[in-house]
Amino acid sequence: MAKLIIINSEKGEKVETHEDIFKLSNLQQREIYAITNERTKSILLNQTFYTILDIENEPKDRVAFDSYNSLFPTSIFSYNRQDRLFGTCNHVLDNNIHYSFALFDSMVDNLSTYLPNDWNIIKIPDSIDYPIGNDLLFYVFDNLVHMTIDQFVNSEEKQMNTVPKCKESQDRIKEVFTDIMSHLYMPAIDYDPQSYNYRISRREIGNLVRDQVFSLVKGHIHLIGPEMESLRNIIMFLHAGNSITFHTIDTSKKSNYIKELEFNKKTKLTMANVLINQRKNMNNFFKGLIKHYMTYGIPNKVYYIGAYPSYWLELITWVPFNIITYDPKYRHVDNDKIIWHDKLFDRNDIETIESKSYIYIDIRTDIRKLDMTKKQRIFKEEDDMIVEIATKLASKQCTVMFKRKIFPGNNMSFGDPLFHPKLTQLGREYYNCITTIVSPSIYKESELYSLLLSARSNNVSNYVYGGSKFDQSSIVNYNSTVIALYSLSNTVNSLETIEHAIKFNHIITFPHRTDRGDWRNIEELNNLSPFQNKKRQLEFEDWSIDPKNYAMKFGCEIVSESVFLQLGHSRALIPDLYNHIISIRMEMPLFYPDRFFSHIGIRQPSIFKRDSYMTSRLSAYISRQLTHSIDLSVLKKNHFEGYSGHLIAIETSFSSLVFTMSPYRWLIRAKKSLTKSKIRDKFKIGDGQPHTREEFENTYDYLKINRLVNSTFHSLLLG
């Protein structure tokens, strides 16, 4: 169970030794005040997955604690030791809708008309309150706008990178606003995968897990079903000199112009439709960049020709390189990685481009006030110029992603014609991406339009990353690692495909079979199947797993997401059963010491059950002793030893303990302790001594005679 530990000097649990930390871990409450010393504070920070607020010594922690008190209770997401994000927002108390999403910046004035008159939209990029405006503004716009896609495509608002003003009455605006605010602030009293509370928890812990996973793996990976949320991680991973085989699914479907035009005329506009043009350029930029990494490795320089206005540049402050942009229309970009040249890029500039650089070209001449004849002439001149620049750059071993136009008759495409999915405008554009000089292929106008129309139904991940579907025939090198985060568990994948991936080194996520009740009270199953009931979560259906059965069959380490984050500096304090489970098969740092995934909280399930029914701790000792003798005086003589309470916890509560430790790792460590006379561990938490083989045998006798479990790890531990 993730805990919030508030370190102070005035009140709380005295935590002076590593044994005190073990005792603290078994306390049942989530929020604990603690009085620590430097040593125990360091252990809590580094060797637990708890969220730590040192309100005595850390100014940022004091600020966070004040915010937490105003929002209590709420989820907390820690991106490092001191930068945090809370799971709700109190800016609404001042009638402010707080957002951080940069693509809204050019739309704020018109978006404000979708809110009640006495409400404001404010941007706070680095607030520790959750930016609910990033979600709320989608909802109010989608429910109040009256335009169709086709009307928006031909509107002035589209040209101005904004949205149409709201034409609804204030009564209707207030009605929609009340609906969404009621949803966002609905108190969570049970597991509800459709709630905003759940959505925030899953979104943010997923981001933390992605960061942690990509910091662990090196070399070559097979990445199954990456979403666009992984884009930053993927670019940083490739920029570090690693490589990726992508596995995605192409969802393109054949269509025709009349059908797609009818769709645009009948379909109501959404915010996703509004944003697609900005996202198109960003996705095209990164599609070409990924191609460069795969071909040449790290680019010497990165260029963007035809950059205005590109509001998406504010979304990518994280890129590990500068982007040199060219456009005579200047815009100040709130991103210090952007170096803007407010001039045209012409043929003379080609010589200044370094070899093995990456260039994205999206030159667009303003033709809005021209007649059709002039437009066609300019389109052709522009396309010829872009092709000339691109091919000359490609001759310098540069990767060039560049805009093209579809013309009547035959068209020359340099490589495959590329069409971004889900575009609103049935225009005449496509893209080429080349890494060297290539001979053009001839496409008829009708062929290109057919490809454009079918691409509308494809998914963005397949377009940007490429790759093929992962299945049981996929070949994985044994020196590679399979990464499947929130993807392989989807029921579109067969169990045979999933088991194929599990065979290799991997990090794979699954939902836990249990999502209601208390994590400390998960009953053992009567079957041995690792895969259990299918789970509906948000818009997806996934295979869920039973951690104990899974670990027994596949021999993998199994922990919850919150526990997994202990491998780095990020932390997540969320409802326990919102956690997904992470399956790990790979070499891990410091596997045997207590540095990572130690047995903190191992007593929580037994204490929870004992306290729930007021059962004396003595009952457990007597019950075990009666397995071998009715002489209970032996208990005192042996100081209540002779059995392993920890092993009982592992065997009876394995599927619970994944929420606080790695029970599988405990078994491997216990097995090793049987062959080592004494193991020194400077990271040790808890004063307990290693058990003997006899004590483990006694414990298994007790479990068997009392029929406490259906299956055990006896052969793993003692075989």
Curated annotation (Swiss-Prot):
State the source organism's domain of life: Viruses
Q: Which UniProt keywords apply?
A: GTP-binding, Methyltransferase, mRNA capping, mRNA processing, Multifunctional enzyme, Nucleotide-binding, Nucleotidyltransferase, RNA-binding, S-adenosyl-L-methionine, Transferase, Virion
Coiled coil start-end = none
Q: Where do transmembrane segments lie in this chain?
A: none
Q: Do the record's keywords include Iron-sulfur?
A: no
Q: Name one GO cellular component term.
A: viral nucleocapsid
Q: Which GO terms describe its biological process?
A: viral process
Write out the annotated subcellular location: Virion
The catalytic activity, as recorded, is: a 5'-end diphospho-ribonucleoside in mRNA + GTP + H(+) = a 5'-end (5'-triphosphoguanosine)-ribonucleoside in mRNA + diphosphate; a 5'-end (5'-triphosphoguanosine)-ribonucleoside in mRNA + S-adenosyl-L-methionine = a 5'-end (N(7)-methyl 5'-triphosphoguanosine)-ribonucleoside in mRNA + S-adenosyl-L-homocysteine
Query: Known InterPro entries for this protein?
Result: VP3_Rotav (IPR011181)
For this UniProt entry, the molecular function terms from Gene Ontology, in alphabetical order, are: GTP binding; mRNA 5'-cap (guanine-N7-)-methyltransferase activity; mRNA guanylyltransferase activity; RNA binding
Its Enzyme Commission number(s) read: 2.7.7.50, 2.1.1.56
Q: According to the UniProt record, what class of enzyme is this?
A: transferase
Which residue pairs form cystines in this protein?
Answer: none
For this chain, the family text in UniProt reads:
Belongs to the rotavirus VP3 family.
| Assembly notes | Interacts with VP1. Interacts with VP2.
Function, as annotated, reads: Multifunctional enzyme involved in mRNA capping. Catalyzes the formation of the 5' cap structure on the viral plus-strand transcripts. Specifically binds to GTP and displays guanylyltransferase and methyltransferase activities. Together with VP1 polymerase, forms an enzyme complex positioned near the channels situated at each of the five-fold vertices of the core. Following infection, the outermost layer of the virus is lost, leaving a double-layered particle (DLP) made up of the core and VP6 shell.
Output this protein's name. Answer: Protein VP3
Query: Could you tell me which species this protein originates from?
Result: Rotavirus X (isolate RVX/Human/Bangladesh/NADRV-B219/2002/GXP[X])
Q: Which taxonomic lineage does the organism of this UniProt entry have?
A: Viruses, Riboviria, Orthornavirae, Duplornaviricota, Resentoviricetes
